[in-house]
Amino acid sequence: MERDRAIIKNYAMNIATFHLTVRQNDPLHLPEHSGSMLRGAFGHALRELSCVTELPDCTQCPLNQQCRYTHIFETQLIKTAQNSQQSSNPYMLRLPKQRTHTISPNQTWSFGITLVGSAIKDYALILKAWQQAIAFGLDNQGNRATGELIKVSNQTLTLLSVERPAQSLITPDWQIRRIPAIDPIAHLSKITLHFLTPFRLQYQGKIAFYPHQFEPKQLLVNLYNRIQQCNQQHDPNADWQTQFSNFAEFIAILDKLTLESDVGSVNVRRSSSRQNRKIDLFGLTGDVHLSADSDTLNRLLPLLWLGQYLHIGKNTTLGLGQYQLQLR
């Protein structure tokens, strides 16, 4: 029987999730994968709120190493030792769950955003950018569909509410609630990664698009590397406890697993304002199953739990690579 409830500790890594509720003023057509639309609106509003030079190209800006927009949205421009080879943005979108793709006036819908490390200190700026983006209007097949951000919550903490506007976005960042950790699960025999959004796994320079190109072991290696990279880049003063002191120790655990996958090809179409065209993002979706003895699976559980929030693969800022754990 699937375990729907796990024992959760109060201790957490420096990662926080925010749930945003929107009330539409104009009809809005949500594309099947709305991450590109949401990310574009967010980036435009964040730049408007942050930029003081109004230069068209951030790479030429003398302040780009201090700019909050650059740190949040154009992280690859920040010159640090951790960015010498690769970089990741300190946020991931959590896409709307609505089955209907047309949101009518006065209807509400919701989505989320996860912030990592130092970006949590900028939560008020980030939520203000979302407020401005939604009020300005999301791209609706060439038109603007305006709305109102009526509520933002961080777990059980309400940060913004139209019912209490004077108290909105004034919570100190240290009071923002971080994600919980997870305790070991007794008699655990199987873990399933159920993907809520497509994932794009790059291996040997190519994106796996067909099931026969996919290796579940490489997915776990990718997740391990992503967690290490996010920890070092965005939260370097903390040690995210994932039960592994080094990569060799992690690989040794993988050899004890029985790995199965039930995945299929999928294509996500995104808009590129810079290139002024549609771009196809090929990837996979489905389930990945891990079976082993309880001790082995519990060694992996903290890492897999953390991956639910960080996502996996490429284009995580668009909300891709999000999965949900199913424990048995």
Question: Which residues does each predicted region cover?
Answer:
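RNA-interacting cores
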Residues: 1-328
